[in-house]
Amino acid sequence: MMLSPREQEKLLIVVAANLARSRKERGLKLNYPEAISMIAFEILEGARDGKSVSELMQAGREVLTVDDVMDGIADMIHDVQVEATFPDGTKLVTVHQPIK
């Protein structure tokens, strides 16, 4: 199976997000890469489902709370930017202050 670099990156996000979700369900607090992957995954899947950029910007703020991540992680993540494929093309989705 031949995957482009972009497809490889998306696949890596899916794997990381699944691992993060599993750890969160076990009651573990997430680290930086786990938090980013969960937010990015929700944006990518939301775009695939046909949601708008504005809907995804809001949804990205609802994925995690400060209680879900290790101390200091929420302060480290100011913005999450994901290039997602929508029915009308590829767009950059930016979520400001995604963890509150």
From Swiss-Prot:
Enzyme Commission number(s): 3.5.1.5
Family per similarity comment: Belongs to the urease gamma subunit family.
Entry keyword annotation includes Hydrolase: yes
CDD domains: Urease_gamma
Keywords: Cytoplasm, Hydrolase
Annotated PANTHER family: UREASE
MF annotations from Gene Ontology: nickel cation binding; urease activity
Record's keyword annotation contains Oxidoreductase: no
One Pfam family matching this protein: Urease_gamma
A GO cellular-component term linked to this record: cytoplasm
Catalytic activity: urea + 2 H2O + H(+) = hydrogencarbonate + 2 NH4(+)
UniProt subunit comment: Heterotrimer of UreA (gamma), UreB (beta) and UreC (alpha) subunits. Three heterotrimers associate to form the active enzyme.
Leader sequence residues: none
Compartments, as annotated in UniProt: Cytoplasm
Organism in which the protein naturally occurs: Lachnoclostridium phytofermentans (strain ATCC 700394 / DSM 18823 / ISDg) (Clostridium phytofermentans)
Biological process per Gene Ontology, one example term: urea catabolic process
InterPro entries, A to Z: Urease_gamma, Urease_gamma/gamma-beta_su, Urease_gamma_sf, Urease_subunit
UniProt xrefs under HAMAP family: Urease_gamma (MF_00739)
Pathway field: Nitrogen metabolism; urea degradation; CO(2) and NH(3) from urea (urease route): step 1/1
Organism placement in taxonomy: Bacteria, Bacillati, Bacillota, Clostridia, Lachnospirales
Protein's name according to its UniProt entry: Urease subunit gamma
